[in-house]
Amino acid sequence: MLTDVEGRAAVKLARKTIESFLSEEKLPEPQELGFELSPVFGEKRGVFVTLTESGLLRGCIGHPFPDSRLEDAIMDSAISAATRDPRFPPVREDELNKIVVEVTILTQPEKINAPAEELPERIEVGKHGLIVKQGYCQGLLLPQVAPEYNMDSIEFLGHTCLKAGLLPDAWLKGAEVSCFEGQIFKEKEPCGEVLEENFSCE
C-alpha cells in the first residue's frame, strides 16, 4: 500500500511526465520533479494511468503485471495513455489544464479457482478489478469501473469479456478469470489536490 504522500507523488509524476513529453518529447529529470520519490517507486508494481476530461475518458493504458519498477511503469503508462490509446487522438499540450490524472496501483492478479457459476459471488464490486483471458484474447477492467457504471458482478464479468473481444458470456464457457485490487489516487480537479478513492464500501 502507498501512503497518501506516495500517492500524490505518483499522480504528480504521471502529470509531469506527460507535460515534459508533450512539450519537449523527453522524460522529466529527477531534479525537475520538485519532490522526492520514496523507495516504493523502485519496486516492481502493476499500474494504470487514466486521463479524463469533463468526466469523460480521454485515455487509459497501463501495466497489468508487476514487470517494471513503479517509477518506470508510471512514466510509460502516462505517455501511453496520453499519446498511444487507439481509442482517442493524442492529447494536445493545450488540453492538459482540462484533464484529470488518475493513477491506480495494482496488486498481483490471481486466477479465481472456482466453477464458472460461482464466479460472480467471488467478485467484490468496487474492490476487485478483472482480467479475462481466452486463447489470444485478453481484457482488463479496473476496480473503479464497476461502481462508476453501476454494474453488478455479472455485468462486470460480461463487460470484461467484451473488452477482451469475447462474447459477454465467455466467462461461463471456459474463459480464465483473474482478479486484482487497486489503490486509486486521483486529482480532484485538473492540476488540483490528489485524493485516494475507495469504492469498496459504496
Swiss-Prot record:
Residues 5-196 form the AMMECR1 domain. InterPro entries: AMMECR1, AMMECR1_dom_sf, AMMECR1_domain, AMMECR1_N, AmmeMemoSam_A, Uncharacterised_MJ0810. Pfam families: AMMECR1. PANTHER family: AMME SYNDROME CANDIDATE GENE 1 PROTEIN (PTHR13016:SF0), AMMECR1 HOMOLOG (PTHR13016). This is Protein Mbar_A1807. It comes from Methanosarcina barkeri (strain Fusaro / DSM 804).
